[in-house]
């Protein structure tokens, strides 16, 4: 049997030995069926399922669905893996779910037609409903959210998706911990185009963030996604891309890790159709005692001849105590394909600091300019001034701490 296996088709056993797989990615931590069971038993304190339809005039209509029947009729497609946290230390699964957690369940669907230019702010928690359900009485909160974006044929959309909400601040101060499970699925129909910036949640409370992004590319579809990670206590991110014939996927991102935060990123790119192109480029800065692992796999499946894939990570280390793990992998089952991968890491360039100081900048300001130069190309893609200013202020706040 071993003789029949090709080395570049085998998953590497060293992956486990390197201890970079901190999370299990085989199943969800809590399934939709379990949520439905809790609703039936009146043990789920809050559910909010919304369908949001956006037409080519950029008007948005909301329909709130709260019945069990509607939830059962709108089950999420589970053909792809979601990140789960199976190592959460609980003694009894059912008892922990029922007694220790207050559940918030949201589901949104955006359908894109024509030309769209829109900023989306997800209303995870409605304050009025929060008070009615006495969520503040619970020690812990489990928030599970589904966002399904459907780009119809020949549509051309630009979206800014901000997953931060001020409403969370009213809850965090009164609760011990939070588990946030965010699942985003983007379905690209044939000849559709999506340009998107995603600002992932930022806070400093004790908690865990599970973030899943799934891209299903149609024929001749094109998507460009910029991801912004500004730091959470424990953050686990996975993106799965399926590329069909002549699908183009361009993913770039920035991250900042600090304090004793953990960031785990997993990029899984699958070329299925012919002549697809995928590009991944990530820039990051690490300070303090933070931890980061970045894993990237590009797989060229049978039948994807003419496809190209590339993945790169560039890291600036500003602390000797920060720990980084990087593992890029290429797997090939087809001929006539091109694949490249790489990673680089380094410290602050003293020559650049000297040059900027010779132009009148202080050392602290010179460091800030160099760091922000890695982030600005992505931040400048945010068209909403309020969101952009918030992102810049958060990043600069953490950078200033390193200068003090």
Describe every region a protein language model picked out.
Residues 75-354, 358-361, 382, 388-404:
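Conserved beta-strand/loop scaffold segments within soluble protein domains that form the structured core
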Residues 4, 8, 28, 32-36, ...:
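Short, structured coil/loop segments at alpha-helix boundaries
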Residues 3-25, 199, 260, 282, ...:
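A generic "cationic amphipathic patch" detector
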Residues 22-24, 53, 60, 69, ...:
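Residue-level detector of solvent-exposed, low-hydrophobicity positions
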Residues 1-103:
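Long, low-complexity, mixed-charge
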Residues 355-377:
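Extended amphipathic alpha-helical segments enriched in small hydrophobics
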């Amino acid at each position: 049997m071993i003789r029949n296996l090709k080395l570049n088709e085998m998953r590497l056993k060293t992956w486990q030995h390197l201890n970079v797989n901190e999370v299990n990615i085989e199943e969800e931590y809590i399934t939709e069926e379990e949520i439905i069971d809790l609703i039936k038993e009146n043990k789920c304190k809050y559910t909010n399922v919304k369908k949001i339809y956006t037409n080519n005039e950029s008007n948005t209509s909301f329909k709130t669905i709260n019945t069990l029947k509607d939830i059962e009729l709108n089950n999420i497609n589970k053909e792809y893996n979601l990140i789960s946290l199976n190592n959460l230390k609980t003694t009894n699964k059912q008892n922990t779910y029922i007694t220790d957690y207050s559940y918030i369940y949201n589901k949104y669907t955006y359908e894109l037609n024509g030309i769209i230019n829109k900023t989306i702010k997800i209303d995870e928690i409605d304050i009025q409903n929060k008070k009615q359900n006495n969520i503040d009485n619970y020690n812990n909160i489990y928030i599970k959210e589904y966002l399904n974006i459907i780009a119809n044929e020949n549509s051309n959309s630009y979206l800014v998706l901000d997953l931060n909400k001020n409403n969370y601040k009213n809850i965090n101060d009164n609760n011990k911990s939070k588990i946030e499970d965010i699942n985003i699925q983007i379905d690209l129909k044939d000849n559709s185009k999506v340009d998107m910036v995603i600002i992932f949640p930022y806070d400093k409370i004790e908690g865990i963030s599970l973030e899943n992004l799934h891209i299903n590319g149609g024929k001749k579809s094109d998507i460009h996604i910029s991801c912004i990670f500004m730091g959470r206590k424990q953050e686990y991110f996975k993106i799965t891309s399926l590329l069909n014939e002549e699908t183009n996927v361009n993913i770039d991102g920035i991250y900042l890790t600090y304090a004793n935060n953990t960031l785990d990123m997993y990029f899984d790119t699958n070329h299925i159709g012919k002549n697809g192109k995928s590009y991944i480029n990530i820039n990051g800065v690490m300070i303090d005692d933070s931890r980061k692992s970045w894993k990237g796999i590009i797989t060229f499946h049978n039948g994807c001849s003419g496809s190209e894939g590339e993945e790169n990570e560039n890291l600036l280390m500003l602390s000797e105590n920060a720990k980084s793990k990087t593992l890029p992998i290429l797997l090939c089952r087809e001929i006539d394909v091109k694949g490249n991968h790489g990673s680089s890491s380094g410290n602050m360039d003293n020559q650049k600091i000297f040059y900027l100081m010779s132009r009148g900048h202080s050392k602290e300001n010179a460091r800030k300019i160099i760091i922000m130069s890695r982030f600005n190309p992505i931040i400048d893609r945010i068209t909403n001034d309020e969101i952009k200013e918030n992102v810049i202020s958060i990043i600069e706040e953490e950078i200033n701490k390193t200068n003090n």
